């Protein structure tokens, strides 16, 4: 199985890079986990709605180039479905049973995701109504992916 985390924006903080690298290493015994960073567009102060839509559309074009036609796409969006860790683990297991070998998680930029990406997604997923920095969300997501595999293994990590 191959998991891709497609993220808009560059990760700047060393402590987040270190945490993500640790979980990538842990995940390597279960799957290949690639993190793909895409350039984000600069958002001008007081950007109009139309300008924001253009920015999200440009970022969406970059995202689409990294999505495979046969990827199971999970886009993170505040309006998405909230899952408990056990449900998330079951979902990842079910995705592979259905014949998908590649799962792509998409984290948008500071403005969120363009509707075209949400439409392409097999699932919109939310980690709740909290607002988190997109860079921190990468660490939270990769930890939950690792946790999902540990749940499948019956590991005490989840306790």
From Swiss-Prot:
Listed under subunit, the entry gives: Homodimer.
Q: Which PANTHER family match?
A: METHYLTRANSFERASE, RIBOSOMAL RNA LARGE SUBUNIT METHYLTRANSFERASE H
Cited InterPro entries: Alpha/beta_knot_MTases (IPR029028), RlmH-like (IPR003742), tRNA_m1G_MTases_N (IPR029026)
Q: What is this protein called?
A: Ribosomal RNA large subunit methyltransferase H
The species is Streptococcus equi subsp. equi (strain 4047)
One GO term describing the cellular component = cytoplasm
One annotated GO molecular function is:
rRNA (pseudouridine-N3-)-methyltransferase activity
Which family does the similarity line name?
Belongs to the RNA methyltransferase RlmH family.
Q: Which reaction does it catalyse?
A: pseudouridine(1915) in 23S rRNA + S-adenosyl-L-methionine = N(3)-methylpseudouridine(1915) in 23S rRNA + S-adenosyl-L-homocysteine + H(+)
Phylogenetic placement of the source organism:
Bacteria, Bacillati, Bacillota, Bacilli, Lactobacillales
- Superkingdom of this entry's organism? Bacteria
NCBIfam families under this entry? Answer: PRK00103.1-3 (NF000985), tRNA_RlmH_YbeA (TIGR00246)
Binding-site positions, S-adenosyl-L-methionine: 76, 108, 127-132
The record describes the protein's role as:
Specifically methylates the pseudouridine at position 1915 (m3Psi1915) in 23S rRNA.
Gene, per the UniProt record:
rlmH
Q: What is its EC number?
A: 2.1.1.177
